[in-house]
Amino acid sequence: MANLNQFCDFTKLIGIDIAKSVFQIYSCDTQTGEITNMQVKRDKVLESLANCGKCLIGMEACGSSQYWARKLQALGHTVRLMDTKLVKPFVRHNKSDKADAEGVYHALVSGVRAVAVKTETERDIQTLLTMRALLVKQRTARINHVRGLLAEYGHVMPKSVDQFDKKVDECINSLEGDAVQLVIDTLRDTFKSIRDDQDRIKTLQREISRLANQTRNAKHFLTVPGVGETIMAYMCVLLADPTQFSSARQFAAYLGLVPMHTGSGGKTVTTKIPGQCDKALRALLVQGAHAMARSKCRTDWVKTILAKKPKKVAMVAIANRMARQCWAVASKGQDWRRMPVTAA
C-alpha cells in the first residue's frame, strides 16, 4: 500500500472512472486507510463528493474530464487529470469499472504526470479551434472534389485556394452546353458551400483571436518568428501552465518534433519523428517554418540549417526551435528577443 503520510493535507484520495451514466469511485481515507469502491450515478457525483472534506481526485484525461475537473475544483478539491496511456499499466485486473477506478487511484498516488485543467476561456478556444479544423478539412475536400470534376471537362484549376475561388465561377459558367443543367447547378451549390465554409472559418478565426488575446502570454507568443494567430491560440491553451513540461525539449517531444531513437548494446539509432502527437499543432508549426524559411528576415541559424540539411528535415528542425521558443517565452513571461552575436 502507498505511504499515505505524504497526502496528510487531504481527507481522501479518490480515483474516478468516468462514464456516461454510472461513475465508479475508488477512495481511500488518509487517516484510517479505509477503502471503498462504489458506483455513483452521474447526477449524484457532485452531491456525493460535496461534503467529504478536501480530497485529491484523479481521473483519466478523456472525454468530459475537463468539465468534471472544473466542477470538482469548484467544490474545493484538488484534481489531477492523467494521460490514459500512463494510467493503463496500473490496471491490475481484467477490464471492469472497478478495476479501472482502482487503476486511476494507484496512478494518482504513484505521481503520474498530470494534464493541466483548462479554464473556461481555454476550453472555448480549444472548441473553436476544433471546429475550425473541421471546416478547413471540409473546405479542402469540397475544393478537391470540384477540381476533379472540372478536370473531366478540360478545366485545370490552380492549387491556391484564392486562385481557385477567382477562377471556379468562370469555369462552371463555361460548362453551358457541354454538361446537363443538373451538373452545373450541383457544382454551383458545392461552390456556394465552399464560400460558406470560408466565411465561417473567418468568423471562427476572429473569435479565436479575440479570446486568445485575453490570455496571459498571447502577445509574447506573437513575437516568436513564424508564429501567427492560429499557432498563438493553440499555444495559449497548451502552455497555459508551462510547468507541466519540465523543459523546452520535453515540450518539443510532446509535439512530435523530436526524432525517436532505438538500440541496445551501446549502439543507438535515430529514426523518424513519431506519429503519436498533436498533429494539428505540429502541422501548423511546420507551415510556420516554411514561412520563416521564405522570409527575407530569417536568422543566420535558419540559413545554416537550410544549407546543411534536406528541406523536410530542416523544416522540422525549425519547427522544433519555434516550439522551444514558445515554451521559453511562456515560462519567463516575456517577449522573444534575438540573442546578440558576440565576437570570438
Segments from the language model and where they lie:
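Phosphate-backbone recognition surface of nucleic-acid-processing proteins
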Residues: H220-T223, E229-K312
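Gly/Thr-rich phosphate-binding beta-strand-loop-beta motif of the actin/hexokinase/Hsp70
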Residues: F7-C28, V104
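Nucleic-acid-processing active sites and adjacent nucleic-acid-binding tracks
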Residues: Q31-C55
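Glycine-rich, often acidic, oxyanion-interacting loops/wings at catalytic, nucleic-acid
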Residues: L129-H220
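Extended, structured, electrostatic nucleic-acid-contact surfaces
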Residues: N3-T11, K202-V227, M235-L238
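Low-complexity, acidic/Ser/Thr- and charged residue-rich accessory regions of DNA metabolism proteins
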Residues: G266, T304-A344
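Short alpha-helix plus adjacent loop in nuclease-associated cores
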Residues: R80-T119, R123, T127, V168-E170, ...
